[in-house]
Amino acid sequence: MPIRNIAVGTPQEATHPDTLKAGLAEFISTFIFVFAGSGSGIAYNKLTNDGAATPAGLISASIAHAFALFVAVSVGANISGGHVNPAVTFGAFVGGNITLLRGIVYIIAQLLGSIVASALLVFVTASSVPAFGLSEGVGVGPALVLEIVMTFGLVYTVYATAVDPKKGNIGIIAPIAIGFIVGANILVGGAFTGASMNPAVSFGPAVVSWSWSNHWVYWAGPLIGGGIAGLVYEVLFINSTHEQLPTTDY
């Protein structure tokens, strides 16, 4: 069971140069992701003179976030694992794949990366960074469930393509698959919650714009979804014994 593998870690681990380097990698990767993702939204609003939301805007957000996450995960993969997301880090912790203290270093770095990216966007664009919020008519309950489900799909994909020791050559496409699932989920949930799936992505714009309406949804949903995905995949597909089905010649 993964619960046996969950570890707090030691202060020495949290301050070890390798951990600090990994934290810096998470900071840079999250900075890249938020700057490109949120920046694309600001650019679209400028081109449309802050017009009403349109399907084209949703598609552009989906593509921008998918591409940016593909790059962000790729550049951090060999150093920190390329989490770029507190929900991914929490899912890895629940599955016993990262210690609590190392995970805290990651999450702090991710949050700082998002804040710096958001603040820099305000400076270079002279525009506000849109904070995540629920669309009109969307209740807190459905929004929470939507964020849980979308993040479950994201972290499950991370486990299947990047964490599973049996992944084999599929690990090569992990950053692409992770970017694709985020892009697809934005097409699903973007019109309702903004499709965060990532507390860091929501946190930076909230700090810079100082807008906290229903902000807890963007923490609770992703952390619950990520934790469930990590637990399910670790218990059912990594720690359980599995024998390949016999092949039959016809």
Curated annotation (Swiss-Prot):
Membrane association type: Multi-pass membrane protein
SUPFAM superfamilies per the UniProt record, alphabetical: Aquaporin-like
Protein localization: Membrane
Chief location of this protein within or outside the cell: membrane
Keyword list, A-Z: Membrane, Repeat, Transmembrane, Transmembrane helix, Transport
Residues spanned by motif NPA 2: 198-200
GO MF term (any one): channel activity
A cellular component term, taken from the record's GO annotations: membrane
InterPro entries membership: Aquaporin-like (IPR023271), Aquaporin_transptr (IPR034294), MIP (IPR000425), MIP_CS (IPR022357)
Positions occupied by motif NPA 1: 85-87
Pfam families, A to Z: MIP (PF00230)
Residues that span the membrane, as ranges: 22-42, 56-76, 104-124, 138-158, 170-190, 218-238
Keyword Cell inner membrane included in the entry's annotation: no
Family: Belongs to the MIP/aquaporin (TC 1.A.8) family. TIP (TC 1.A.8.10) subfamily.
Domain commentary: Aquaporins contain two tandem repeats each containing three membrane-spanning domains and a pore-forming loop with the signature motif Asn-Pro-Ala (NPA).
Role: Aquaporins facilitate the transport of water and small neutral solutes across cell membranes. May have a role in buffering osmotic fluctations in the highly compartmented vacuole of arbuscule cells.
Protein name, entry field: Probable aquaporin TIP-type
Source organism of the structure: Medicago truncatula (Barrel medic)
Native organism taxonomy: Eukaryota, Viridiplantae, Streptophyta, Embryophyta, Tracheophyta
Gene name for this UniProt entry: AQP1
